[in-house]
Amino acid sequence: MSAMDSLVARAEAISSDAERVTEAKLRKVTLPLGAGVLGLITLDNGEDHTKPNTFGPRGLLSLNAAIDAALADDEVTALGITGKPFILAAGADLTSIAGGGPDAVRTVAELGHAVFRKLGEGGKPSFGFVNGLALGGGLEVALHCDYRTVMDSAPALGLPEVMLGLIPGWGGAWLVPNLVGADKAVTLILENPLSQGRTLGGQAAFALGLADACFSGADYLEQSMLWAAGVLTGSVTVDRPEVDRGEAWDAALARAEEIVASKTGGASPAARRAVELVAAARTADLDAGFAAEDQALDDMSK
């Protein structure tokens, strides 16, 4: 049995009817500009906007199957992921995970990493289309993609985990500092959650560097797919600033310590662990960074 097969079996063993399952629905879309066929995955739990998409064991397994199907389809040249109207996803389904037994947190942490990273490592270009609310794992799933667009009117993007006594556990603590630098990561992972759960709107998230393009809501998905076609054909170039791993990283960690001291009095193990993860992301590779997130969540669940 492969490591992934074993992980899937563990996830199936802790699945329960308590989960409001977010299904990952795959359809093929012919892109403009002769860019090929996009395997577009839409996350949808079948509820209205008052009940956001979330990821429990079954939802992650549904996404895993959709990604695998898109990667295995020779007609599909690129992958995209978006959500039901105005919602990408609101992170983990904590209620369903809570009833899964002592190893549930570790299992779901590892499964989320294993599934999400296929978006960036599957061998086909991937696009995260952030069409609305994206919190915690809902933002992290987009961060795993090679490219991202965001709707300008998206109401709430962020990594609120520290406010909940957790850490960004599906890649965020490593991906964000390595994408936008440590200082912006400290803002997203520590300062905002500890400032009464502050989040970003779509335009602010774009300005922070979390997305490569920002489009209006009226025809957001169409504009995003046209932009993706441009990336694939080479008519659109994505430039990202180089991450400063020197003094700027040191300064960011010093600011993180000040935030933790002023906001929590040093009494938040989650905030303390988040600082350690951002510090480690400076030199850790992706595997080590994700393993550290798994371990942190496992430790905090005991």
What are these language model-derived features?
Residues G36-D44, L60-D103, A114-N131, M151-A156:
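A structural preference for short, pocket-lining loop segments at secondary-structure junctions
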